[in-house]
């Protein structure tokens, strides 16, 4: 499913758009989790990245990227907002390494134009949490610039560019549910109402979605390095889970607490440390929330829906 576009510009006005237009594009892009994550061997041709076989699921926790054209030659700017910026708020953070900025540069190079765009990111997705917040920001930037510059490139072309930036960025362009292979960048969408989606629902991947988040962060390379040492635990749908828990034991405690409270599924999200729990109904969701609060095994609880999709808005 393609991103939802709201408030489209009248067709008659499109030819008037140029770099000086005051039009602003806003994209809300959801977090991602991995319902399954099988990790294979590392490949030198992929820069040492591991082979992955995963089922992506976008969940309704959104970062918002706002893009406005600047004067020609003015260059780009980046502003970060939100209460959960993590390391992004550090004065040592290089904005040119921000995922959204890298996505802007990649789009500018592909379009053969200068990246004269003002970006504002409102963060709600926890940082360094295994929820794809940086990938969501990159995907949102690509969708915004595609609209702002009136490129009208199809999703497949955007995914080709996104694959040069990160494993799950191609998925974040559309959200929903999808299979990911290669190093995670090869996307096969799972259509709403399809047999594959119904199978996931029957397995318990439906209802309320709860995210247990932490102030602490995990480095994805460190988690993969630990995985190379300890491997996957038997029965784990996420092969990185044992490695993440060894580095962040509270994640394991949160999984145990959610499971005992009646979660249909509870697991480390991606490389962690966040924990995602699916609850069949409101009562089960409330039990999980209560036990997480009572035992303090998570620092922040986010309630969300899934599957979710990006939303694109246009304002004058």
Swiss-Prot record:
InterPro entries for this protein: GHMP_kinase_C_dom, GHMP_kinase_C_sf, GHMP_kinase_N_dom, IspE, Ribosomal_Su5_D2-typ_SF, Ribsml_uS5_D2-typ_fold_subgr
Pathway membership, UniProt: Isoprenoid biosynthesis; isopentenyl diphosphate biosynthesis via DXP pathway; isopentenyl diphosphate from 1-deoxy-D-xylulose 5-phosphate: step 3/6
GO biological process terms on file: isopentenyl diphosphate biosynthetic process, methylerythritol 4-phosphate pathway; terpenoid biosynthetic process
Catalysed reaction, written as an equation: 4-CDP-2-C-methyl-D-erythritol + ATP = 4-CDP-2-C-methyl-D-erythritol 2-phosphate + ADP + H(+)
Key word Transferase present: yes
Alphabetic keyword roster: ATP-binding, Isoprene biosynthesis, Kinase, Nucleotide-binding, Transferase
Disulfide bonds: none
Enzyme Commission code: 2.7.1.148
Molecular functions (GO terms): 4-(cytidine 5'-diphospho)-2-C-methyl-D-erythritol kinase activity; ATP binding
Matching PANTHER family: 4-DIPHOSPHOCYTIDYL-2-C-METHYL-D-ERYTHRITOL KINASE, CHLOROPLASTIC
Family that this chain belongs to: Belongs to the GHMP kinase family. IspE subfamily.
Protein name: 4-diphosphocytidyl-2-C-methyl-D-erythritol kinase
Organism phylogeny: Bacteria, Bacillati, Actinomycetota, Actinomycetes, Bifidobacteriales
Gene encoding the protein: ispE
């Amino acid at each position: 499913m393609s991103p939802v576009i709201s408030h489209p510009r009248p067709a008659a006005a499109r030819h008037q758009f140029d770099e000086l237009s005051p039009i602003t594009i806003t994209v809300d892009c959801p977090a991602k989790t991995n319902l399954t994550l099988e990790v294979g061997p590392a490949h030198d041709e992929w820069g040492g990245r591991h082979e992955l076989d995963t089922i992506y699921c976008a969940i309704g926790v959104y970062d918002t990227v706002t893009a406005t054209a600047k004067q020609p030659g003015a260059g780009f700017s980046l502003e970060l907002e939100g209460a959960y910026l993590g390391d992004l708020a550090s004065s040592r953070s290089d904005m040119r390494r921000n995922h959204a900025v890298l996505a802007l540069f990649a789009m500018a190079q592909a379009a053969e134009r200068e990246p004269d765009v003002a970006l504002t990111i409102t963060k709600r997705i926890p940082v360094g949490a295994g929820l794809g917040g940086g990938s969501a920001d990159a995907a949102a930037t690509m969708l915004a610039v595609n609209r702002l510059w009136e490129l009208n490139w199809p999703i497949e072309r955007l995914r080709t560019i996104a694959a040069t930036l990160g494993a799950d960025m191609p998925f974040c362009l559309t959200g929903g549910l999808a299979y990911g292979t290669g190093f995670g960048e090869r996307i096969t969408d799972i259509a709403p109402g399809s047999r594959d989606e119904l199978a996931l629902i029957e397995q318990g991947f439906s209802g309320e979605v709860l995210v247990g988040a932490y102030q602490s962060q995990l480095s994805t390379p460190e988690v993969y390095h630990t995985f190379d040492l300890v491997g996957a635990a038997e029965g784990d749908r996420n092969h990185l889970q044992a490695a993440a828990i060894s580095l962040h034991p509270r994640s394991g405690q949160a999984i145990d607490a959610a499971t005992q409270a009646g979660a249909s599924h509870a697991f480390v999200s991606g490389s962690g440390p966040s924990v995602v729990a699916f609850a069949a109904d409101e009562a089960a969701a409330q039990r999980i929330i209560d036990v997480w609060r009572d035992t303090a095994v998570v620092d922040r609880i986010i309630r969300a829906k899934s599957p979710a999709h990006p939303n694109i808005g246009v304002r004058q």
